[in-house]
Regions:
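Short coil/turn segments at beta-strand junctions that form active-site/ligand-binding loops
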Residues: 12, 40, 104-105
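Pre-Walker A adenine-sensing motif
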Residues: 1-7
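Mid-core helix/loop region of P-loop NTP-binding domains shared across ATPases and GTPases
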Residues: 60-123, 131-136, 175-180
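Walker A/P-loop
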Residues: 25-37, 44
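Conserved, well-folded catalytic cores of nucleic-acid-processing
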Residues: 7, 34-38, 70-78, 95-99, ...
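Conserved catalytic segments around the Walker B and adjacent sensor/switch elements
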Residues: 37-56
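The catalytic "switch" region of P-loop NTPases
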Residues: 53-55, 104-106, 126-185
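Walker A/P-loop nucleotide-binding motif
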Residues: 10-30
Length: 185
């Protein structure tokens, strides 16, 4: 809990990994609720991942343009999203800078992150590196099953720059129903 909160408010890059049923989604819900109840000025961006899959044959992969659109739409509702990649990137940076200067922080949370394509993982590094002067504009929290840990392994040369910047926290599996109920309630 504390690690996720710290990541959200301090511009960190974090992956939360656990087996199905280990409480990952509950932790995400608690984070969003804690930020709201504490009155913290953190805008949480949660791209829709309803039909997300790693490849086209199994569903629709979540790509960098979709993430940029989600950030722009959440941080600056009603703002049009430019179709060209260059203009979209400029608009994204502009809305994050303006929002940051207005006193807000931003946290991108992606559930089912184990289904992210490697190209999208690489693009997340670029999102995370957006700054206004020395101030980082976006925290990133990836939430996924154990396959995400495999993707973020130091043996994955495709995403080594992401691996070097992303902290990975592994949730232990819930062994007893009582443990789960105590965690959940």
């Amino acid at each position: 809990r504390a690690t996720m909160h710290d990541a959200a408010v301090n511009g960190n890059f974090l992956a939360v990994v656990g087996e199905s049923g280990s409480g990952k989604s509950t932790l995400r819900e608690e984070l969003v609720e804690r930020l709201r109840l504490n009155g913290e000025s953190v805008i949480v961006v949660e791209p829709y991942t309803l039909s997300m899959a790693e490849s086209e044959k199994n569903g629709k992969p979540l790509r960098a343009p979709h993430i940029a659109e989600a950030i722009i739409s959440t941080v600056s509702p009603g703002t049009s999203v430019p179709p060209s990649p260059e203009m979209r990137a400029r608009k994204l940076h502009k809305v994050l800078v303006e929002s940051s200067r207005a006193g807000f922080r931003h946290c991108l949370v992606i559930e089912e992150a184990h289904d992210l394509h490697m190209h999208t993982l690489k693009a997340l590094k670029r999102f995370w590196e957006l700054k206004d002067g020395m101030r980082r504009l976006l925290s990133i929290i990836l939430i996924g099953q154990t396959e995400l840990k495999d993707k973020l392994s130091s043996t994955q040369s495709d995403v080594r720059e992401v691996v070097q910047r992303c902290d990975v926290v592994e949730l232990p599996p819930v062994k007893q129903p009582g443990d789960f109920l105590a965690f959940r309630f």
